[in-house]
């Protein structure tokens, strides 16, 4: 059998025309320099506003410290009153518990000094309920 001839596609005579491969986008938006300038301006504005807020925050912090310093003697006096009240209640409880022990001196200091020694937590809350000890040690807790 005779092989059939295949006709091959060829370019047109004279070749194909020029192909437009460039993107023709309209020029729009800011130039690179102007975008850089806007970015620097935004950065400077951010630094300026942050500097202003830091100054205001420092002023508020100083005001809080001054208020805390002004209230410190009152808070210390309240704490001292509470401690002395608890020590008095502890002495009364010690007197009732140790009344039958011969030679026991109620309120005798365990320290051999005449100076004031701030009582420890165990000394203050030794005769208290465990809920009160937990509340004094850890503050308010839900699970007790």
UniProtKB/Swiss-Prot annotation:
GO biological process: apoptotic process; negative regulation of DNA-templated transcription
Annotated family: Belongs to the complex I NDUFA13 subunit family.
Organism for this UniProt entry: Bos taurus (Bovine)
Transmembrane annotation, as ranges: 30-51
InterPro entries recorded: GRIM-19
Keyword terms, alphabetized: Acetylation, Apoptosis, Electron transport, Membrane, Mitochondrion, Mitochondrion inner membrane, Nucleus, Respiratory chain, Transmembrane, Transmembrane helix, Transport
Main location: mitochondrion
Entry membrane topology: Single-pass membrane protein
Function recorded in the entry: Accessory subunit of the mitochondrial membrane respiratory chain NADH dehydrogenase (Complex I), that is believed not to be involved in catalysis. Complex I functions in the transfer of electrons from NADH to the respiratory chain. The immediate electron acceptor for the enzyme is believed to be ubiquinone. Involved in the interferon/all-trans-retinoic acid (IFN/RA) induced cell death. This apoptotic activity is inhibited by interaction with viral IRF1. Prevents the transactivation of STAT3 target genes.
Subcellular location: Mitochondrion inner membrane; Nucleus
Disulfide bonds: none
Gene: NDUFA13
N-acetylalanine modified-residue sites: 2
Gene Ontology molecular-function annotations: NADH dehydrogenase (ubiquinone) activity
Domain of life: Eukaryota
Known partners and oligomeric status: Complex I is composed of 45 different subunits. Interacts with CARD15, but not with CARD4. Interacts with STAT3, but not with STAT1, STAT2 and STAT5A. Interacts with OLFM4.
Entry GO terms, CC: cytoplasm; mitochondrial inner membrane; mitochondrion; nucleoplasm; respiratory chain complex I
Name of the protein described by the UniProt record: NADH dehydrogenase [ubiquinone] 1 alpha subcomplex subunit 13
The organism's taxonomic lineage, starting at the top: Eukaryota, Metazoa, Chordata, Craniata, Vertebrata
